[in-house]
Amino acid sequence: MSNNPLWDYSIAAYSLEGVAPACLALQDIFGLDVNVLFYAAWLAQLEQRLSHDHLAGVEAVIADWRHDMVKPLRALRQRWHQVPDAVGIRDEIKSLELRAERQQQDTMYAHYQGSAGLPWAARPLRENLALVASFSGHEDAGRFAAI
């Protein structure tokens, strides 16, 4: 998929000051999927409220890819941080990880395009992100707003 406004939004948002460390903390501490967080935030920017059923559908279409591709590549890249002279290899793995995340977001965007639409809401960001946090299953996920 060549045109994906979700991916464009995610790249722009991730580059903002403070966003990357906050996203990584939410990922590492609470087990939240940063791509799903960006999806919720992107929908909020469009003034669309994320529903439980819609999020469950998104999770269903990305779960295998995330489990089989994205997470193993991330773990592999993180293990290569322990090898001091392997920056080139680590960068290649990071590139593959980003391509896998792009594919995940392409799948998410395709799901969005195929959905019946989401209800309009004025400033639904907090609600959308709280719903994503509740899907993580982490007992303290409700506190993620502090990060």
Task: Show which residues each predicted segment covers.
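Short, low-complexity, intrinsically disordered N-terminal peptides in bacterial proteins
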Residues: 1-6, 145-147
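Short amphipathic alpha-helical segments and their helix-coil junctions
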Residues: 6-27, 113
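N-terminal interaction modules that seed assembly of large macromolecular complexes
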Residues: 21-59
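Short alpha-helix boundary/capping elements
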Residues: 31-35, 43-48, 66, 98-104, ...
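A non-catalytic, amphipathic alpha-helix used as a structural packing/dimerization or gating element
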Residues: 57-68
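N-terminal intrinsically disordered, cationic/polar leader segments
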Residues: 71-72
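A charged, amphipathic interaction segment
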Residues: 78-147
